[in-house]
Amino acid sequence: MSETSKIIAVTSGKGGTGKSTVCSGLGYTLAKQGHRTLIIELDFGLRCLDIMFGLQDKIEHDLSDVLSGKMNALDACAKVPMASNLEILCAPKTLTPVTAEQIYSICRSVKKYYDYIIIDTGAGINSHVFDIVEQANLILVVSTPDQVCIRDASLMSDEFYNRGNKSQRLIINKVSKKVIGNSLVKNLDEIIDKIGVQLIGVIPEDFKLTVATAKGDPIPTESEALLAFDALSKRLNGDFVPLTIKGA
């Protein structure tokens, strides 16, 4: 892919990790920092980004219109009012066949218009996801601090490495306030060791963010999770931001 845009694939070993929330938070903060950002949603039949950004009644077109040749990708994208530099290309409401080449053909067609293209992959360990992330510049593996997610994230990461995808980073999501503090550091280290991927961000569990995204309200500026996404966005852009637990 061209150097004019950076393609980031956000994926997880299982559903329920908050992968789409990570995509929305990351896309929002990148856009707020002045980066032209597009999120392409691939959870076919299970789309949710429209709700997260309060656009559930305003999406006129989605990825199926592009795949069918009805319209080009730029025209199918929806602008997000709460962040002027952010656009989303929503997944179809129904299951629709798609190949990795089709997705990257779309990326190639719009790459000069964006600084970052975030691909919200479907969850799960399968060849389709592995093919989709093949040409991404960076893979963000999302896990929560529970044993099932950790094991699945480890299996997924190992398969990425086996396929030659070396550029991976780990995001630990939904970290409860109850365990934020010195006692968590050892547990975080254990998670990193088990998954085998360098940590780039810890996102605290945040009730305000959960409620806002569920209702399609603007992301609350006082949200601790938003501070963590802001720090994560800066790291992805090459800035040095110390990785702390609170506001990670």
Label the predicted regions.
Residues E3-F44, V110:
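Walker A/P-loop phosphate-binding motif and the immediately C-terminal alpha-helix
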Residues I39, I119, V141, R169-I172:
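Structural beta-sheet core signal
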Residues I39-K112, V211-P218:
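P-loop/Walker-type NTP enzyme "switch/lid" segment
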Residues F44-L46, T94-L95, G124, D146-V148, ...:
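Conserved nucleotide-binding/hydrolysis micro-motifs of P-loop NTPases
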Residues L89, V110-H128:
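Glycine-rich phosphate-binding loop used to anchor ATP phosphates in small-molecule kinases
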Residues N126-Q147:
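Inter-motif core of Ras-like GTPase G domains
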Residues R151-N165:
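Conserved C-terminal guanine-recognition region of P-loop GTPase G domains, centered on the G4
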Residues N162-A248:
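C-terminal lobe/tail of nucleotide-utilizing enzymes
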